[in-house]
Amino acid sequence: EVLEAIEGALRADKVELFLQPVVTLPQRKHVFYECLSRIPLGDGALLVPQRYLQLATERGLVSAIDNLLLFRLVQLVRAAQRDHLDIGFFCNISDATMRDVAFFQDFVGFLAANPSLKNSLIFEFSQAVIDSDDLETRINLQRLTQLGFRLSLDRVSHLDFDGADLAAQRFGFIKVNAHMLHEYADHNSVANLRGNLSRHGIDLIVEKIESEDMLADLRQLGITYGQGFLFGEPRAARIQNDR
């Protein structure tokens, strides 16, 4: 059923773009949006990446999904720029797409031909693919940053960051799960983490903030960017066609 849904969505151009806000704290002002993919099932339900990503990876379909999502996102960015909205969009690039040489070549070529996108798009990559220290990955990241695009580290599994190395690769953001940050330890440990990142010009965004109590604990740690259901659940993007 899942494979049929993926293939049907790709054939019908039906991969949907959802947005979740990233806010400043304590103001809760929307300053960024995380872009998320959803694949519709026949009964009106939606598949989230956790349900389809492994199968899509095995079948070599992830780049096609990323391609459709990027197309939707570009439409959205252009509409936001026409309306002079000062907002940024985080766009996740999957590990499989990073390894798809043909797709990534076309992807970089498209971005080079559309330089205005660099002001609004921030590309996210998993900590695992960055930690692999693969030469081809570093070259691909460099190609993006040479075009002026900002980068973000996502799907973080450990907090042993090399701030200098990430800054050298032009990472400007790191997203960390709120539960992981709570487990990390005390106020001083988090302050040291934030200090290490801020010295290298990297902003920390805490995601999966789900309650006011959780937020209160995080505010005591000096967190300035947040994301999670407390500030807004993912909602379908309303995209206007290019005029």
Predicted stretch roles:
Residues E1-L55, G232-R235:
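Active-site core of bacterial EAL-family cyclic-dinucleotide phosphodiesterase domains
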Residues Q75, Q105-G109, E136-Q146, N188-N196, ...:
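Alpha-helical scaffolding segments of alpha/beta enzyme cores, especially the outer helices
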Residues L25, I39, D95-T97, I122-S132, ...:
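EAL-family c-di-GMP phosphodiesterase catalytic domain
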Residues D83, N114, L147, R199-H200:
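Helix C-cap/helix->beta junction micro-motif
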Residues L41-L46, L70-V74, R155, G228:
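Short acidic-capped amphipathic helix/loop micro-motif used as an active-site/signal-coupling element
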Residues E1, D86-I93, R235-R238:
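Flexible, glycine/charge-rich interdomain/linker segments that couple
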Residues K14, G60-L61:
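Catalytic-site/binding-pocket detector for metal-dependent nucleotidyl cyclases
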Residues L61-E136, K208:
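Catalytic core of bacterial c-di-GMP phosphodiesterases, primarily the EAL and HD-GYP domains
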